[in-house]
Amino acid sequence: MQIEDYEQVYALWLTISGFAIRSVDDSKEGVERFLQRNPGISVVAEEDGKIVGAILCGHDGRRGCLYHVCVDPAYRRRGIGKDMVVHCMNALHKEGINKVSLTAFTQNDVGNAFWKEIGWTKREDLNYYDFVLNKNNIIRFNR
């Protein structure tokens, strides 16, 4: 994926149910920052010049993560999603990454079935937490 793909990818994201977009992280600037930090790892799938699938993929030097995995519903069940995942996994492996995670909404039945189908393991032994950091709450972490 290149930043030039952003408009088509963003339009695709808007068509996917069970998907969440954040205005800051998923802005063009946010995605460009992510792609610069993780060059050559994210991927798009194209059919006749149209982007029909995308994965934002990156790592922190220790663990990999897949974000915003999506395939246009009209193009599903053709192996596009699996091919994109294989691309990302190979790219991460070349970077020395040996463990990869992702987050899927509990009620995203299509997505959850896909991950199980291609051999991913759903973790039952941990809780997932996040914290939306902004200028108003950063003071919690100042001494």
Stretches with model-predicted labels:
Residues 20, 32-44, 65:
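A short helix-loop-beta-strand connector motif used in the catalytic cores of GNAT acetyltransferases and
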Residues 46, 69-76, 104-105:
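A short, internal acetyl-CoA/4′-phosphopantetheine-binding micro-motif in the GNAT/acyltransferase core
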Residues 58-67, 76, 123-126:
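A conserved beta-turn-beta hairpin within the catalytic core of GNAT-like acetyltransferases
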Residues 68-71, 77-90, 117:
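Conserved acetyl-CoA-binding loop-helix of GNAT-fold acetyltransferases
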Residues 85, 92-104:
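Conserved GNAT acetyl-CoA-binding A-motif
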Residues 102-111, 130-133:
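Conserved beta-strand-loop-alpha-helix junction that forms the acyl-donor binding cleft
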